[in-house]
Regions:
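A residue-level marker of the well-folded mature domains of exported/periplasmic proteins
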Residues: 1-127
């Protein structure tokens, strides 16, 4: 009880808002959502196909991040921004540092780079 979650794929704030409105939730548990830029990814793939570059993307897995474009992100609309001490301006500045390469994000899926977790993982809440 009284937990919080991060939605995935699309802005899921509406689930919490609707849950509060209909009485399912006592509060909105969604802090934010880790969104995929599906529109951007599809447009990029279609542009590659239109340009005749199908062989570059056929039978492959795409791995799109901020360094490549707006392929991932957080919802920044005022009604979805639920952070109390992290502003949208700070978020946009952080995104720019990732895009420019000033901050590097490890995109590896190698087991040696994955964090070790178990059912005994401790989560520290910062208020």
């Amino acid at each position: 009880s009284n937990g919080y979650v991060v939605g995935v794929d699309v802005d899921q704030n509406y689930i919490g808002v609707n849950g509060v409105a209909d009485g399912s939730f006592a509060y909105n548990p969604f802090i934010t959502s880790a969104m995929k830029g599906l529109t951007e990814a599809v447009n990029t793939a279609l542009s590659d196909i239109e340009a005749g570059d199908w062989s570059d993307i056929a039978a492959s897995n795409g791995n799109f991040g901020l360094e490549d474009g707006d392929y991932v992100g957080l919802p920044t609309d005022a009604d979805s921004w639920n952070f109390e001490t992290f502003t949208t301006d700070e978020y946009e500045a952080l995104k720019e540092k990732i895009k420019s390469g000033e901050i590097a994000v490890d995109n590896s899926s190698d087991d040696s780079t994955k964090p070790t977790v178990s059912e005994f993982t401790t989560v520290n809440y910062i208020q």
